[in-house]
């Protein structure tokens, strides 16, 4: 039914719509939990192409430096090393929730790393998921 009452659209709605969480229940708990504590609710971080390219370049350099392979091929590091670095960087960053870190590391462990337990840059850049 149509009414004369004006609907107020919150100014943060466009940012909220960008979030598109993979786990709606987890996201809703985090979102409404943050609102109840007077904190800024989670929104999807927008990374521009040049910034993303720099991140991939940095990841490649880290993998090359830490690689246990020195005979050509793509640089690879043990998953345990990647897990330690990712967890440490996420903690230092302070904007990545521990639940996100756990989900991401679990996904990589189950779906990305090979039977040798090594992870490489191509696993991120060429993985269709």
Swiss-Prot record:
SUPFAM superfamilies: Dimerization-anchoring domain of cAMP-dependent PK regulatory subunit. Keywords: Cell projection, Cilium, Flagellum, Ubl conjugation. Residues 11-34 form the RIIa domain. GO terms for cellular component: cytoplasm; motile cilium. Sumoylated, sumoylation decreases upon spermatozoa capacitation conditions. Important for male fertility. With ROPN1L, involved in fibrous sheath integrity and sperm motility, plays a role in PKA-dependent signaling processes required for spermatozoa capacitation. The RIIa domain mediates interaction with AKAP3. PANTHER family: ROPPORIN-1-LIKE PROTEIN, ROPPORIN-1B. 'Ropporin' comes from the Japanese word 'oppo' which means 'tail'. Homodimer. Interacts with AKAP3. May interact with SPA17. Interacts with RHPN1. Interacts with FSCB; the interaction increases upon spermatozoa capacitation conditions. Interacts with CFAP61. This is Ropporin-1. It comes from Mesocricetus auratus. The gene is ROPN1.
